[in-house]
Swiss-Prot record:
Residues that bind substrate: 74-76, 110-111
Keywords associated with the record: Lyase, Molybdenum cofactor biosynthesis
Record-linked NCBIfam families: moaC (TIGR00581), PRK12343.1 (NF008999)
Protein name: Probable cyclic pyranopterin monophosphate synthase
Name of encoding gene: moaC
InterPro entries: Mo_CF_biosynth-C_arc (IPR023047), MoaC (IPR023045), MoaC_sf (IPR036522), Mopterin_CF_biosynth-C_dom (IPR002820)
Protein's organism: Methanospirillum hungatei JF-1 (strain ATCC 27890 / DSM 864 / NBRC 100397 / JF-1)
GO molecular function: cyclic pyranopterin monophosphate synthase activity
Upper classification of the organism: Archaea, Methanobacteriati, Methanobacteriota, Stenosarchaea group, Methanomicrobia
Reaction equations catalysed: (8S)-3',8-cyclo-7,8-dihydroguanosine 5'-triphosphate = cyclic pyranopterin phosphate + diphosphate
Purpose of the protein: Catalyzes the conversion of (8S)-3',8-cyclo-7,8-dihydroguanosine 5'-triphosphate to cyclic pyranopterin monophosphate (cPMP).
Family of this protein: Belongs to the MoaC family.
Assigned EC number: 4.6.1.17
Subunit structure: Homohexamer; trimer of dimers.
Length: 156
């Protein structure tokens, strides 16, 4: 049976990491948003009414990464030393990849996942008017495959 460090007698608690040493931490997470072809073209061409979609998604992801401990209750507040956010167009959407770097007592996987999720949600928000069908539904739009691609932990 797996051991869950954030549960104590079925009560949620924040794990004490004070005795751990600081080490280099890196996490890379990715996820994809599926969009209509016309929407992808509008993003590429810079004609989305709300503005520069990917620049806005990059800023939103950066802010979310810094706010991760406020969003994920048992996540420790750790120093974030570096963030890299990239976007790649696919045939049917956009893939966001977020890298977070720290030197701390705990990993940065949650920060990377929150960053990817927020980037993709921001893209959706900025293009939702173009993605809706005549009934106000989103038959094409979807967010998928959010996952951690890489986790690094090395002594300093």
């Amino acid at each position: 049976m797996p051991v869950f460090t954030h549960l104590d007698d079925d009560r949620a608690r924040m794990v004490d990491v004070s005795a751990k040493g600081e080490v280099y931490r890196k996490a890379v997470a990715t996820g994809t948003i599926t969009l209509r072809p016309d929407t992808l073209s509008a993003i590429r061409d810079g004609t989305v009414v709300k503005g520069n979609v990917l620049a806005t998604a990059r800023v939103a992801a950066t802010l979310a990464i810094k706010d991760t401990p406020r969003l994920i209750p048992m996540c420790h507040a750790i120093p974030v030393h570096g963030i890299d956010i990239t976007f790649d167009y696919t045939k049917t959407g956009i893939t966001a990849t977020v890298t977070v770097i720290s030197a701390g007592k705990t990993g940065v996987e949650m920060e990377a996942l929150v960053g990817v999720s927020t980037a993709l949600l921001t893209i959706w928000d900025m293009v939702k008017s173009a993605e809706k069908d005549e009934k106000g539904q989103y038959p094409v739009t979807g967010i998928s495959d959010i996952r951690v691609l890489e986790k690094v932990k090395q002594d300093l």
